[in-house]
Amino acid sequence: MKLLRIGAPLIIASALALATAGAVAAGEIKGKVNVQGIKSAADIAVYIDTGADKKFDVPKEHVVVDQRRMTFVPKVTVVLQGTTVDFLNSDPVGHNVYWPSISGNKKLAHNLGTWPKGEKKPFQFNDLGVAALLCNVHPEMSGYIVVAPTPYFAVTDRDGNFEIKNVPPGDYTLKTWSEDGKPVTQTVKVGAGSVSVELTVKK
């Protein structure tokens, strides 16, 4: 019985040490996206495209895209493949959200219909790619859902800065998507600390 009493805390301590080591080992990618021929460095999606060869748990919590003052908020939303997005209508008028394709595949087109203020429509994005959000009622509205293969992603601020946290150590390929620029890929090696990268997106 004494051996059991002594061993149990040792097992627990070892498990805690391993868990702590795993948490400490996670790194982060801090970067900046420069642009050429594009009016703004804001709202550019940056995500790990390859290198994380595993299946990820889909978040139970839904991501919310609001419709406010005749705009999609946020304009660009990145989600892990399989995530459900709730499209909320905060405007006093009805909206009809649809996308004509996902990355050019018209078979993935979808129309959510029209709904009034205060209500929301959910949709689960199971296909990788980019859905260009439009509104049948208000043609001036536009937004984007970028469906990524990993949960390691970010959207640039107005100065082009971004930060991707809690990335396991490894060799990865970063990829960008922007409304007006061509995609850019760059390899990055992530360790236990922070790694800095700089990307240039051209029209």
Where do the model's predicted regions map?
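Bacterial N-terminal signal peptides that target proteins for export
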Residues: 1-11
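Hydrophobic, helix-prone linear segments
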Residues: 3, 19-20
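Bacterial N-terminal signal peptides
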Residues: 9-19
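Extracytoplasmic copper-binding redox domains, predominantly the cupredoxin/blue-copper superfamily
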Residues: 24-203
